[in-house]
Curated annotation (Swiss-Prot):
The gene is pyrG. Its EC number is 6.3.4.2. It catalyses: UTP + L-glutamine + ATP + H2O = CTP + L-glutamate + ADP + phosphate + 2 H(+); L-glutamine + H2O = L-glutamate + NH4(+); UTP + NH4(+) + ATP = CTP + ADP + phosphate + 2 H(+). The keyword DNA-binding does not apply. The lineage of its organism: Bacteria, Pseudomonadati, Pseudomonadota, Alphaproteobacteria, Hyphomicrobiales. This is CTP synthase. L-glutamine binds at G353, F381, G382, M383, Q384, E404, R469. CTP binds at S13, D146, I147, E148, K186, T187, K188, P189, T190, Q191, K222.
Length: 542
């Protein structure tokens, strides 16, 4: 029978509920338990697929093709368990489900209300499909007091009564700010946050208190007294140097012990944290460092590239080097020479993106990397721009472009109109909806034997996650290969180009998929490990 941990947040947003949930999941997993993590998002979008990357951050894609919140990336990286579309739900999805049911007559003429219909939909989502797990950790998005989060709070309150006694625990993540003028940490914001949570009928079992310095014992006792939790259940969550320190830090503070005690599991099996200690040791004691330029379109919000950033650091862990990131807005290269920006870097990465803005700058970055023999990693849009660069400057395809940018006589990159997913033919048109209409999720690819990328994978058969509407036009394949660009990977039916490379370049690889989504600190993705290895070699030349 599954036990449930509900994680809420108070005082301010962006406290790190996702990291806290993921770290707790990793700790329980290290004790041998089977763990599932789920995210409940209060926004009215059906999913984040059409939301601006500079507002919402990264859209994390699962194997089964769901466009989800970036916190699911944290869940996967910390636990190694691949999430599914049933691990994330939004208010928009819930209301859509309810309205669809109402239109079908499923409610038999009843007046559809927030209670019980919305709350029941939320509860059904939380508890279904959990028979194979020991613990289900549910993160509630937003902050206590938000209007949008009210149905979720009511639903998890009801679940505290619906579930068998002793199978639900509430963890409240809060902030204890330091006031320089007073020279002390303040408990009042946490007190008020807990008071508001209690007014909703939820009594936290554990307080996880964020702070930038040690919380004095007297202040912990004060929180225990005023927030009605055991002194041992006031857990300090101090700032750490990197997020992979969090599981060990929380274990030292006793979070996992306290959660298990709240469930009455004593004595609990000891956690095996050796792999996490090795990761943290490699991060703390690098044997070198490299600088990677990320030439992107959404550099104003680094969360737009969250999995990418982490995957690069995973590559650093694999090579025992520190990875420094140089962020460059791609539009800069449309006005300025890229050389002064890129001459000193050890690798260039052009990530995914949408739309014409900044595309020429990415093409210039690809040309610089090709001509100067700097390691280049093009992901999704970054691969497409590298192919357009080759078409223009190597294959003499004047006007080579993408139909994403408008009509063109040389559509080197074009809209995918149809492809096969499973046994079903998927069809799209330029006039179709944007939401949920891309080539999404895991697809297989066949790599050409003897290519650099097949050597990196150690296989010619791979499966990676995709999120794109446009694809390199296979009609240009022969012309490009005659100029030295190798199409090293194709879809199994040979229709869709998946990877490209230059055999005479130290490391120039483009992939249509998103390998960053499958990288883990305990299991770095081979492409990122190889890219950072190549950058390390480049650092000895610069």
């Amino acid at each position: 029978m599954a036990r449930y941990v509900f994680i809420t947040g108070g005082v301010v947003s962006s406290l790190g509920k996702g990291i806290a949930a993921a770290a707790l999941g990793a700790l329980l997993q290290a004790r041998g338990y089977r763990v599932r993590l789920r995210k409940l998002d209060p926004y009215l979008n059906v999913d984040p697929g059409t939301m601006s990357p500079t507002q919402h951050g990264e859209v994390f894609v699962t194997d089964d093709g769901a466009e989800t919140d970036l916190d699911l990336g944290h869940y996967e990286r910390f636990t190694g368990r691949s999430a599914t579309k049933t691990d994330n739900i939004t208010t928009g999805r819930i209301y859509k489900n309810i309205i669809d049911k109402e239109r079908r007559g499923d409610y038999l003429g009843a007046t559809v209300q927030v209670i019980p219909h919305v709350t029941n939909e939320i509860k059904d989502f939380v508890i279904e499909g959990n028979d194979d797990y020991d613990f289900v950790i549910c993160e509630i998005g937003g902050t206590v007091g938000d209007i949008e989060a009210m149905p979720f709070m009511e639903a998890i309150r009801q679940l505290g009564n619906d579930l068998p006694r002793g199978t639900a625990v509430y963890v409240h993540l809060t902030l204890m700010p330091y006031i320089p003028a007073a020279g002390e940490l303040k408990t009042k914001p946490t007190q008020h946050s807990v008071k508001e949570l209690q007014a909703l009928g939820i009594h936290p079992d554990i307080l996880l208190v964020r702070a930038d310095r040690e919380i004095p014992e007297a202040e912990r006792r004060k929180l225990s007294l005023f927030c009605n939790v055991r002194p041992s259940a006031v857990i300090q969550a101090l700032d750490v140097a990197n997020i992979y320190d969090v599981p060990i830090a929380y274990h030292k503070e006793g979070l996992d012990d306290e959660v298990l005690a709240a469930f009455g599991i004593e004595p609990a099996p000891k956690p095996r944290l050796d792999p996490w200690e090795e990761v943290c040791n490699r991060i703390r004691t690098p044997e070198g460092e490299v600088t990677i330029a990320i030439v992107g379109k959404y550099t104003g919000l680094k969360d737009a590239y969250k999995s990418l950033i982490e995957a690069l650091h995973h590559g650093g862990i694999a090579n025992r080097v520190k990875v420094n990131l140089e962020w460059i807005e791609s539009e800069v290269f449309e006005k300025e020479d890229p050389a002064p920006y890129l001459e000193k870097v050890h690798g260039i990465l052009v990530p995914g993106g949408f739309g014409e803005r900044g595309s020429e700058g990415k093409i210039h970055a690809a040309r610089f990397a090709r001509e100067r023999k700097v390691p280049y990693f093009g992901i999704c849009f970054g691969m497409q721009m590298a192919v357009i660069e080759a078409a223009r400057n190597l294959a003499d395809v004047s006007g080579a472009s993408s139909t994403e940018f408008g009509p063109t006589k040389e559509p080197v990159v074009g809209l995918m109109t149809e492809w096969v997913k499973g046994n079903e033919l998927q069809k799209r048109t330029a006039a179709g909806d944007l939401g949920g209409t891309m080539r999404l999720g895991a697809y297989k690819a066949a790599l050409k034997k003897g290519t650099k990328i097949s050597d990196i994978y150690g296989s010619t058969d791979i499966s990676e996650r995709h999120r794109h509407r446009y694809e390199v036009n296979v009609d240009y394949k022969d012309r490009l290969e005659n100029c030295g660009l190798v199409f090293s990977g194709m879809s199994p039916d040979g229709v869709l180009p998946e990877t490209i490379e230059y055999p005479d370049h130290p490391w120039f690889i483009g992939v249509q998929y998103h390998p960053e989504l499958k990288s883990r600190p305990l299991d770095p993705h081979p492409l990122f490990a190889s890219f950072i290895e190549a950058a390390t070699e480049q650092s000895r030349l610069v």
